[in-house]
């Protein structure tokens, strides 16, 4: 069967990483498809982070979703291309929708839904494209002190959400620098390009706030919720995330 270019492109952008760790060790498994992983052989005594990057079909995700007994709403949720930050608790886990934001090549805001599914010892993250967004967190686990790897999956979720919020703040700083450049140009000699630049920045900032405020609301509700999947010793870290937004 001959694949079209779009199918080949999607396959090239698919990736599965499984990070398993405990206080003194860490192991990373790489795969291009969930069917390549023998899920039953995962050590359930270790904290496990499954990173799903790229676009997979429901059939391709079946080995993963079946092993972790995903609720149908979770399967439906991870295929959303646009999603408002939210969380929902199920019997077996906590499902969280968030957004990764960046500026594209044209300077417009690009927001990509990021989904998390948290169980007692497992965190699964879904990012709709293959990129190195979470690589700094993987590096932190590799190089971090044993105390960091001693923490469980609920703390790992905190690290990832906090990293996303830090990324928001860096983007705000970048937008601020762009605004200063535009303002300096206007002070010297305003022209039609400066007016267009201001209008574009207003558009970008408006879209940015449309992403950030729902994220802030979600984290606030998340902090107030008494979830069984977030331990008491970790809850204050989530409060810190909310205070940064």
Segments (PLM) and residue ranges:
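Peripheral, non-transmembrane regulatory/ligand-interaction domains of membrane transport proteins
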Residues: 1-244
